[in-house]
């Protein structure tokens, strides 16, 4: 397979750089070529090219107009393309590179799959499965090439698994790396050396993560795991896990139920009015949509949340007790709070049972299919029925009544709080805490916090985009060039689009973003806007009845964006040599 060198000099456009790298890699694979890609941005260098590779390079593709340090390539032939050209047609970029590359140029690089290299497989995943999933995959792939190892990465994103690992690749691997912020299924890796980490180490320092994995990985699940009986990985201690990660796993699996149920209910109301679910309309399309959304989709929300919290803690044996406990919580009107408690009781309870119940080897197979599900379900079911169910139901009823009765200053304060949290760390723990709280309340038919959270999450990238267009002297050329991409991400409710700007000047940028998002959230809550879907950004506004008080909701977004832009103008200093 022919191999080529690519340097993406992105400046502030780090998000577009990662997308361009992935597009080039896929296009090169389709064309029967391999590419070694280095990404250079204001956040650092990802996948730095080793000296022996740069010294022997004959042809190099330079993407972008920032500094690519081309002096290190000596007399190599350089082909320059813009980021936009590569994103628009990566196949054409690969073809242009191939046309300038002599047949002998393949000797300039050494394929990481050579006989002397380690074989590594990895899985990357994050709670929402959008940004960090693919950035972590990119970091691992670049790091493996730098170290001379063969790397295959399976991404478990929002649309499911991509580039799935084969059984042959897993068998041949020297180590398995799980770079994920939520739990993933490890059943395939029984008997393999396995190392678990979050996505951030893979993004920030892939080579160090790979070296640590090779040195510290432990054998997962024994040589032949029995249907998840030994579900708790010995490698689990390699990375810090905790309640937050388990909760985010549950939320991640719950979101599709919330989205499907909420939008189908909104469509039912659009077709048949607010009484579409009444028996008087039985047999109509609107009534059917309401039954599917409310009686099926929403009914499974809390069991899915609880089941996958338990799965994150205890692996497969925890799913059945968790889901049953979640359904018990829902039937007791304990809602998402009860589901969270049921999930943790089931997860930690099953994990403890699995650890302390010892059976003869020939009876070990009974644990995952009989003993753990029955005892785990008994534990969580009785705990919810007699201990936690009613108190949590009373607490949720009070919280629901309080939220529904919010007016004036109370709604304003909650909107300010949720909005500020959404912008504080843009996809981090504080952001996810506000998002999980708002999403969970949908199960109790409380939709105003969800509306506030989404409008606040859209505000930072859109506010930055507006500021780069209006207050040009506060931003570099590279920052202004990536503003369109940030704006598109904002429209899609991907708050992470603002991260490159915040990383460059956090002390001035983050306060401006928090102010704008807090204002947007406060206006949304005060206006009583409701949102029945947990995601979708500006595009969900096109669905009838998905958002109430639509004009006020759009006003909240516009005001929040403008406030963000003005705050950036006031807080950021002019950039030298930039004309407004």
UniProtKB/Swiss-Prot annotation:
Signal sequence extent: none
Gene disruption phenotype: Cells lacking this gene grow normally on glucose but are unable to grow on fructose.
Swiss-Prot/TrEMBL catalytic activity: D-fructose(out) + N(pros)-phospho-L-histidyl-[protein] = D-fructose 1-phosphate(in) + L-histidyl-[protein]
GO (cellular component) term, any one: plasma membrane
TM segment ranges: 254-274, 289-309, 332-352, 369-389, 410-430, 451-471, 483-503, 509-529, 549-571
Residues modified as Phosphocysteine: 126
SUPFAM superfamilies attached to this UniProt entry: PTS system IIB component-like
List of catalytic residues: 126 (phosphocysteine intermediate)
Residue span(s) of domain PTS EIIB type-2: 1-99, 120-215
Function: The phosphoenolpyruvate-dependent sugar phosphotransferase system (sugar PTS), a major carbohydrate active transport system, catalyzes the phosphorylation of incoming sugar substrates concomitantly with their translocation across the cell membrane. The enzyme II FruAB PTS system is involved in fructose transport.
PANTHER family hit by this protein: FRUCTOSE-LIKE PERMEASE, FRUCTOSE-LIKE PTS SYSTEM EIIBC COMPONENT-RELATED
Protein name, UniProt field: PTS system fructose-specific EIIB'BC component
Gene: fruA
């Amino acid at each position: 397979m022919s191999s080529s060198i690519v340097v993406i000099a992105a400046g502030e456009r780090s998000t577009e750089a990662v997308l361009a790298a992935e597009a080039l890699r896929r296009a090169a694979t389709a064309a029967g070529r391999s590419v070694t890609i280095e990404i250079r941005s204001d956040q650092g260098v990802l996948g730095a090219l080793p000296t022996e590779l740069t010294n022997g390079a004959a042809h190099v593709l330079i993407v972008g107009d920032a500094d690519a340090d081309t002096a290190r390539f000596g007399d190599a032939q350089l082909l320059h393309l813009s980021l936009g050209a590569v994103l628009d047609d990566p196949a054409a970029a690969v073809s242009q590179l191939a046309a300038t590359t002599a047949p002998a140029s393949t000797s300039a690089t050494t394929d990481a799959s050579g006989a002397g290299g380690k074989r590594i497989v990895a899985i990357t995943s994050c709670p929402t499965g959008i940004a960090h999933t693919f950035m972590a995959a990119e970091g691992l792939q670049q790091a493996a090439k730098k170290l001379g190892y063969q790397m295959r990465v399976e991404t478990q994103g929002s649309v499911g698994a991509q580039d799935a690992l084969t059984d042959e690749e897993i068998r041949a691997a020297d180590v398995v790396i799980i770079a994920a912020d939520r739990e993933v299924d490890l059943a395939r890796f029984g008997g393999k050396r396995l190392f678990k980490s979050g996505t951030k180490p893979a993004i920030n320092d892939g080579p160090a993560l790979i070296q640590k994995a090779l040195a510290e990985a432990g054998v997962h699940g024994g040589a032949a795991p029995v249907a998840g009986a030994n579900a708790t990985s010995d490698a689990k201690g390699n990375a810090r896990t905790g309640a937050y990660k388990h909760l985010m796993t549950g939320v991640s699996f719950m979101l599709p139920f919330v989205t499907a149920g909420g939008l189908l209910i909104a469509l039912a109301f659009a077709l048949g009015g607010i009484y579409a679910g009444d028996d008087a309309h039985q047999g109509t399309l609107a009534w059917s949509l309401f039954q599917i959304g409310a009686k099926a989709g929403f009914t499974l929300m809390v069991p899915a949340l609880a089941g996958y919290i338990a799965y994150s803690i205890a692996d497969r044996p925890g799913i059945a007790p968790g889901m049953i406990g979640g359904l018990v919580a829902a039937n007791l009107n304990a809602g998402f709070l009860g589901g969270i408690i049921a999930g943790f009781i089931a997860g930690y309870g099953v994990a403890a049972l699995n650890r302390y119940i010892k059976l003869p080897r020939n009876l070990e197979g009974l644990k995952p299919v009989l003993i753990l599900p029955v005892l785990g379900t008994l534990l969580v079911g009785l705990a919810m029925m007699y201990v936690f169910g009613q108190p949590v139901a009373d607490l949720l009823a009070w919280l629901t009544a309080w939220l529904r009765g919010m007016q004036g200053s109370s709604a304003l304060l909650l909107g300010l709080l949720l909005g500020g949290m959404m912008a504080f760390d843009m996809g981090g723990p504080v952001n996810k805490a506000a998002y999980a709280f708002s999403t969970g309340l949908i199960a109790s038919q409380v939709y105003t916090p969800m509306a506030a959270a989404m409008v606040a999450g859209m505000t930072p990238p859109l506010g930055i985009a507006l500021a780069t267009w209006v207050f040009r002297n506060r931003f570099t050329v590279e920052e202004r060039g990536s503003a369109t991409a940030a704006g598109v991400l904002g429209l899609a409710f991907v708050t992470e689009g603002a991260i490159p700007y915040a990383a460059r000047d956090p002390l001035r940028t983050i306060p401006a973003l928090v102010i704008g998002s807090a204002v947007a959230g406060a206006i949304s809550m005060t206006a009583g806007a409701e949102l029945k879907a947990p995601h979708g950004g500006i595009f969900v506004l096109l669905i009838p009845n998905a958002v109430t008080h639509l004009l006020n909701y759009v006003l909240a977004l516009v005001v929040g964006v403008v406030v963000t832009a003005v705050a950036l103008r006031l807080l950021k200093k002019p950039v030298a040599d930039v004309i407004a």
